[in-house]
Amino acid sequence: NNTDITNIEDMLSLIEKTNNKENISITYMRGTKENTTNLKLSKTEDNVYKTGLYVKDSITGVGTLTFIDPNTKLFGALGHEIIEKNTGQRLEIKDGKIYGSSVTGITRSDIGKPGEKNAKYDSSKVFGTVSENTSSGIFGKYTTDIPDKKLFAVAKEENVKTGKASILTVIDGNTIESFDINILRINNNGNSTKNILFEINDEKLLKDTGGIVQGMSGSPIIQDDYIIGAVTHVVVDDPSKGYGIFITKMLEEAEN
């Protein structure tokens, strides 16, 4: 009936209201192409109509907030795009939110098997709205009071160098900790999210996590008291190593 559907509840409601429950016409987007087809419904013993479609209208995940601009309250997180695992496509965000969360445990990384942060989030603690999901991270507006934390100057790409640095991340509860890393290589490829190759040489972090784990994406990389980038990927064959994106790329994307 030419009604736009934005969630599963709307879809089920319209199916119940339609007169012809044998076949319904639907229009959908695949990439940039619009398609129309007929959908055959099946009625269960409980008088519930099934479409045979796999449909979901939301996705959740654990990641790390990289920065908040104190002047504009724009924020950036993750340092890479969110991919829908079933389609392999970048997820289009229309009404995203970031929430306060607490790390409850760590599944350690091992060679060939990345670990992850286990966390719980409080849906009543909305910290901001997400408006963009890009190759450089997710971006939006921080809507609560900015925490009274240390401000970092931003390093230019040409000032990032190999050698000592650190990452800021949470591995227990809400406590932000600094862990030592060593930057091995710099890649100035303009389109890459792997500008910085580093290894962890912090014994505590290696002991507790086995290296980089999922959920650390977005963790700020600090060098000489400047923010230089954010963690983006783990080296699967050696989880003590990881990649990061230049912070300047994330800031440029946020401003756009």
Map each language-model feature to its residues.
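Conserved PDZ fold ligand-binding element
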Residues: 1-9, 221-224, 228-229
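Short, solvent-exposed mixed-charge patches
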Residues: 255-256
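PDZ-domain C-terminal substructure recognizer with occasional recognition of PDZ-binding tails
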Residues: 12-51
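PDZ domains, with a preference for the canonical peptide-binding region formed by the helix
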Residues: 2-27, 238-240, 244-249
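Short loop/turn microsegments at loop-to-beta-strand junctions
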Residues: 216-218
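Short, surface-exposed secondary-structure boundary micro-motifs
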Residues: 2-3, 29, 170, 232-233
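Extracytoplasmic/secreted cell-surface and envelope-processing proteins
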Residues: 7-8, 35-37, 208, 240
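Serine endopeptidase catalytic core focused on the charge-relay Asp
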Residues: 42-210, 214, 223-224, 232, ...
